[in-house]
């Protein structure tokens, strides 16, 4: 769960 939603 990251504050940015990228598939990284």
Swiss-Prot record:
Species annotation: Delia radicum
Signal peptide range: none
Similarity section: Belongs to the allatostatin family.
Leucine amide PTM sites in chain numbering: 8
Subcellular location: Secreted
Name of the featured protein: Allatostatin-A1
Swiss-Prot/TrEMBL GO biological process terms: neuropeptide signaling pathway
Coiled-coil boundaries: none
